[in-house]
């Protein structure tokens, strides 16, 4: 559209064209973000992640504490983490982890119905791989947009990494309390031993904490934790670890 005033001609861009421009910019930004995630994950097939989105957020808040505090985190190889802890987490968080494709459709549908009944997001039906996707790149915010991005990153993780590597990164990056990340830091923080020495009962209690690590950190030794740990301990023997284990 061209508007004419006297001898001056002014080009006016139509609203439709602005919408097309904005859509193109948004699409380009979205694709660039997905490419960034994809490349990062591909690199992690042979390089360990330095930190996660959750760690960086916590580090900022901890630095403003009085006195300032730091993240507790120490990467250890997969074979230096107790099999008890691996089995406890799979028994608690994702029983079909070794064989699923990163998604549990039944759990997702159940979470959808629960959220619809509550009128807000209260459950996510997340597998271990989905939890890792969220921890690595996203925030604690609960929204359907974030959930959609989580599902895309989950596909990338399952496509680019094998199950053992996914589990190794998860074990080294999952939160176990305010500022406590990874199996090694958790084992030393709660039991003053390395992750390789965690027993079955200790592992079961740590697995219970994963959905609400900060709450359990502040309410250690609760009756619920003990009851839930007993259930997990009974299931650990049937937990299937990734094939190479």
UniProtKB/Swiss-Prot annotation:
Q: Which GO terms describe its cellular component?
A: peptidoglycan-based cell wall; plasma membrane
Query: Which EC number applies?
Result: 2.4.99.28
Q: Name one GO molecular function term.
A: pentosyltransferase activity
Q: Under which pathway is this protein filed?
A: Cell wall biogenesis; peptidoglycan biosynthesis
UniProt subcellular location: Cell inner membrane
Q: Where are the transmembrane segments?
A: 19-39
Principal EC category: transferase
* Alphabetical list of SUPFAM superfamilies matching this protein: Lysozyme-like
The protein's annotated catalytic reaction(s) are: [GlcNAc-(1->4)-Mur2Ac(oyl-L-Ala-gamma-D-Glu-L-Lys-D-Ala-D-Ala)](n)-di-trans,octa-cis-undecaprenyl diphosphate + beta-D-GlcNAc-(1->4)-Mur2Ac(oyl-L-Ala-gamma-D-Glu-L-Lys-D-Ala-D-Ala)-di-trans,octa-cis-undecaprenyl diphosphate = [GlcNAc-(1->4)-Mur2Ac(oyl-L-Ala-gamma-D-Glu-L-Lys-D-Ala-D-Ala)](n+1)-di-trans,octa-cis-undecaprenyl diphosphate + di-trans,octa-cis-undecaprenyl diphosphate + H(+)
Which key words are in the record? Cell inner membrane, Cell membrane, Cell shape, Cell wall biogenesis/degradation, Glycosyltransferase, Membrane, Peptidoglycan synthesis, Transferase, Transmembrane, Transmembrane helix
Its main subcellular localisation, reduced to a broad class, is membrane
Note the InterPro entries from the entry.
Glyco_trans_51 (IPR001264), Lysozyme-like_dom_sf (IPR023346), PBP_transglycosylase (IPR036950), Pep_trsgly (IPR011812)
Q: Which NCBIfam families match?
A: mono_pep_trsgly (TIGR02070)
Q: Name the family.
A: Belongs to the glycosyltransferase 51 family.
Designated name of the protein? Biosynthetic peptidoglycan transglycosylase
Q: Which gene encodes it?
A: mtgA
């Amino acid at each position: 559209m061209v508007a004419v005033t006297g001898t001056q001609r002014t080009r006016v861009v139509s609203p439709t064209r602005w919408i097309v421009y904005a859509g193109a910019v948004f699409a380009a930004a979205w694709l660039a973000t997905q490419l960034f995630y994809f490349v990062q994950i591909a690199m992690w097939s042979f390089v360990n992640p330095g930190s996660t989105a959750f760690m960086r957020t916590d580090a900022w808040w901890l630095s403003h504490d009085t006195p300032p505090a730091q993240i507790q985190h120490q990467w250890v190889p997969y074979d230096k983490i107790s099999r008890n802890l691996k089995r406890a987490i799979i028994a608690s968080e994702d029983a079909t982890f070794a064989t699923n494709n990163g998604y549990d459709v039944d759990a997702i549908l159940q979470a959808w119905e629960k959220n619809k009944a509550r009128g807000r997001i209260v459950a996510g039906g997340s597998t271990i791989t989905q939890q890792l996707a969220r921890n690595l790149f996203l925030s604690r915010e609960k929204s359907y947009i974030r959930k959609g991005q989580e599902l895309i990153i989950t596909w990338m993780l399952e496509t680019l990494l094998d199950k053992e590597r996914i589990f190794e990164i998860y074990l080294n990056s999952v939160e176990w309390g305010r500022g406590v990340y990874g199996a090694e830091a958790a084992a030393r923080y709660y039991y003053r031993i390395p992750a390789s020495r965690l027993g079955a009962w200790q592992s079961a209690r740590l697995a219970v904490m994963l959905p609400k690590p900060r709450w359990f950190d502040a309410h250690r030794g609760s009756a619920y934790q003990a009851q839930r740990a007993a259930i997990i301990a009974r299931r650990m023997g049937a937990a299937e670890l990734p094939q190479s284990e």
